[in-house]
């Protein structure tokens, strides 16, 4: 019993370390609890910061499920105790004590815990996630489908009914965390997976514009890595000097035409008539 309580505490405390918030604070990214989908998880960080930050958070979240389960196995805990340790890690991720109980949805932590608990089950769940995400491009739908199948995969591969309840509880918690996604999927408002450029990628993509300015000095170069509003403003700024030159030329031409059309002012010749006396 003491080992059971110890492993539950370790799993919960490790799960409470929210890597999404830590990564965003470390690298100066927006708070994932306030921006994007407002979920401090890997998918939201992927949208806010880019692929490298999303992958970083995903790996850390998976480790939060892997490490407690491996510890439980090293301590020769019963399979049901190992399964409850995985549940504790997922609960810690969803309701972290260190971050006012506002956590993520537990998908990456669940997959990590399943990989450590039974590698084949973890691979099957991860493969299901990738398959659904690849075809439908909805992260939430992929999470719902893959985690929902996890307890049934365990029945097929392990056949131990004692581990079904904790795995089923994980599924219920993940589905509950995705309740808003359910409504958005039904209404057709759920955003699809899109990769945002990272800060490093934006800097690297901005370098061709700088080289173009060096290659053609004195010419206006419009930056192609900015949004449409700024592009329009720059295009108008380039056109304005040309428009001014055209206006001044038109004025000069008009003034010349006016001078040519004006009749020459001729003074009437006055004849002096001398009266003969």
Swiss-Prot record:
GO biological process: phospholipid biosynthetic process
Catalysis performed (reactions): an acyl phosphate + sn-glycerol 3-phosphate = a 1-acyl-sn-glycero-3-phosphate + phosphate
Domain of life: Bacteria
Biased composition (Basic and acidic residues): 216-239
Any one GO MF annotation of this record: acyl-phosphate glycerol-3-phosphate acyltransferase activity
Residue stretches in coiled coil: none
Keyword Protein biosynthesis: no
Subcellular location: Cell inner membrane
Classification via InterPro entries: G3P_acylTferase_PlsY
Enzyme class of the recorded protein, top EC level: transferase
Keywords: Cell inner membrane, Cell membrane, Lipid biosynthesis, Lipid metabolism, Membrane, Phospholipid biosynthesis, Phospholipid metabolism, Transferase, Transmembrane, Transmembrane helix
This protein's pathway: Lipid metabolism; phospholipid metabolism
SMART domains per record: G3P_acyltransf
EC code(s) of this entry: 2.3.1.275
Family: Belongs to the PlsY family.
Record note on quaternary structure: Probably interacts with PlsX.
Descriptive protein name: Glycerol-3-phosphate acyltransferase
Species assigned in the record: Legionella pneumophila (strain Paris)
